[in-house]
């Protein structure tokens, strides 16, 4: 019999509810990490799932490292010898980057690509600001100020559009002049990334999504492999992250999401796939 430790009844239910779509509403300080750790161990010990068949997405690297450490320790205490590093644990960005690296030859990126951090991205736009300042309607889009400030505003627009997976052609053909300007800004920026063999944090997810959508074999291999997905802080996921989750989980449908805001979970409730609606208000809410 599985040793749940000091888990209460609601946590035990969350740990052992492994099949289908599972929603756990949980507030801060209510044992979310404890429950996710036990759930991963339960899958390995009781269900015979291999570490590489589990994906766990967090919103900070610190949270991901904590999960890895605690799962490793928990398995060691149970004398279960597996390589936890084979699990897909990390932020959405790190998980998407891992998928890209594993299939780099199927992306637009070459082997010596460079990943831009926030400053690098802003500096790239600043250094190439002349490519943006002649775009029709750019002055109406940006506030008055120097090129550095306006470069920062451009990056904000670009990142938001990338995260929401907005179609460039749709933007550029929109009836609204301001929307068309945004489309041109995004187009110029993406050309810069391609020319420089560059990728930034927001386009990591876009490139990963494109990779999966344009390469059926890669998608099917990942869908076969990743049998269980767990997403922490689900209410904070953006559109493209959600699309990637449901794309990867489309075969097995074993997706567990944890969130502390009922309103923020409405998208999951509206999923077309049947799911288990698990509430644990006494201990996980």
Regions found by a protein language model. Name each.
Residues 277, 284-285:
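Single conserved hydrophobic/aromatic residue that forms the stacking wall/gate
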Residues 72, 76, 130-133, 194, ...:
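A general structural signal for alpha-helical elements within enzymatic catalytic domains
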Residues 16, 94-97, 101, 156-159, ...:
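Generic alpha-helical structural context detector
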Residues 17-18, 83-86, 105-198, 202, ...:
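ATP-hydrolysis module of ASCE/P-loop NTPase motor domains
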Residues 1-109, 220, 263:
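P-loop NTPase Walker
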Residues 4-16, 20-23, 55, 63-64, ...:
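Conserved helicase NTPase motor core
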């Amino acid at each position: 019999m599985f040793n749940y430790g000091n888990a209460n009844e609601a946590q035990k239910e969350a740990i052992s509810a492994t099949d289908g779509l599972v929603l756990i509403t949980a507030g801060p300080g209510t044992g979310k990490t404890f429950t996710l750790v036990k759930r991963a161990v339960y899958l390995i010990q009781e269900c015979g799932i291999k570490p590489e068949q589990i994906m766990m997405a967090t919103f900070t690297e610190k949270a991901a490292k904590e999960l890895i450490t605690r799962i490793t320790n928990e398995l060691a205490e149970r004398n279960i010898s597996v390589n936890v590093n084979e699990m897909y644990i990390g932020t959405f960005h790190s998980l998407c980057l891992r998928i890209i690296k594993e299939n780099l030859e199927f992306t637009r990126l070459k082997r010596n690509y460079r990943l831009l951090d926030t400053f690098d991205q802003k500096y790239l736009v600043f250094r190439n600001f002349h490519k943006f300042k002649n775009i029709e309607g750019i002055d109406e889009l940006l506030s008055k100020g120097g090129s550095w400030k306006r470069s920062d505003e451009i990056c904000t627009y670009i990142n938001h559009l990338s995260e929401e997976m907005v179609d460039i052609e749709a933007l550029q053909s929109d009836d609204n002049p301001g929307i068309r300007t945004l489309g041109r800004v995004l187009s110029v920026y993406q050309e810069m990334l391609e020319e420089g063999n560059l990728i930034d944090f927001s386009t990591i997810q876009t490139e990963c999504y494109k990779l999966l959508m344009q390469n059926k074999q890669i998608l099917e291999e990942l869908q076969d492999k990743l049998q269980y997905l767990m997403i922490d802080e689900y209410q904070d996921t953006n559109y493209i992250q959600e699309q990637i989750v449901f794309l990867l989980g489309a075969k097995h449908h074993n997706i567990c999401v944890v969130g502390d805001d009922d309103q923020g979970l409405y998208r999951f409730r509206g999923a077309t796939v049947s799911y288990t609606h698990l509430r644990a208000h006494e201990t996980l809410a």
